Amino acid sequence: AKQAVMDADLAQMDALGLYYDYNHLSLADTVKAYLKEFGIDESQIAFSYKDLNSGKTAAMNDHQPMTAGSTYKLPLNMLVVDEVEKGKLSMTERFDITGTDYEYDQEHNAYVVQFNGAMSIPDMQEYSLVYSENTPAYALAERLGGMNKAYQLFGRYGKVSGAIPTIDRNDNKTTTAYYVQVLDYLWRHQDKYKDILYYIGESFPGLYYKTYLPHVKVYQKPGYVREALNVGAIVCEESPYLIALYSSGLGGATEASEEVNDLGYAQLVNLTYVINEWHRVNHNMA
């Protein structure tokens, strides 16, 4: 059965230049083969994978601190839904955003104008998840008592032993071992978080984990900042799986980088193909 998938997918593998011994290697070794071929140091990649049908897991550098970027916006949104479910927040009320914290004044000012100074929680959810913008994320955090308070609550969805149990607010570091637990919690409570799933199902069409999977439903939360390019995803292949994939310095990106590195992005996207293809060959038939 594995060989049948290899044969069926051979043309695309060859076209992309991403042919590996998928049916004989572990997931980590497949990823390492890709990194070796393209001269990427193993320390630049961390991932955690979980097959949702079998419960089987795989990982590489999963406790290594990695820059989270905007991936924090997923558990942040989950916290706000929890408060709505408890009856503590309204989905229809519009909240003043003129005085919220922000990262970029131009973005903040544009939101104030666009929404006449106030946003509802559904607006904040959509714009923080579909477009991954910061102003609506700060507005969500304000509903919880501010960003510092929100980060203190991230342990609700999982934690790991070590210096960074969840996501560290100070230097924006996390681990894929933590983030895959967030994805797992989200999927196990998908009815409660159906709005969040809808938005991350709509996010970044044709990009990140969706690039090579146009016919597969993918729920994804990408994160980019400086040297980091990441994506957390729930991939609904025949056998669905979770993947937290974080990277550092791909394509020569540095902590001084202010734009997405094109080569680095291509390398990350190729890695999404490699991971998904390994899954197709080894787990879809399970």
Residue ranges and their predicted role:
Residues 1-39, 57, 65, 142, ...:
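Structured C-terminal helix/loop/strand segments within mature extracytoplasmic catalytic/sensor domains
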Residues 11-28, 99, 113-192:
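Active-site-adjacent helix/loop patches that line small-molecule binding or acyl-intermediate pockets
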Residues 23, 92-108, 129:
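Acidic helix-start/capping segments at beta-turn-to-alpha-helix junctions
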Residues 39-41, 88-89, 117-121, 212, ...:
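Extracellular/periplasmic catalytic domains that process cell-envelope and extracellular macromolecules
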Residues 41, 81-93, 145-152, 156-162, ...:
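Bacterial peptidoglycan biogenesis and beta-lactam-recognition machinery
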Residues 41-65:
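Short, conserved catalytic-motif segment at the N-terminal edge
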Residues 55, 66-97, 128, 243:
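Active-site SXXK
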Residues 60-64, 103-116:
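Charged, often glycine-rich, active-site loop that binds/positions anionic groups
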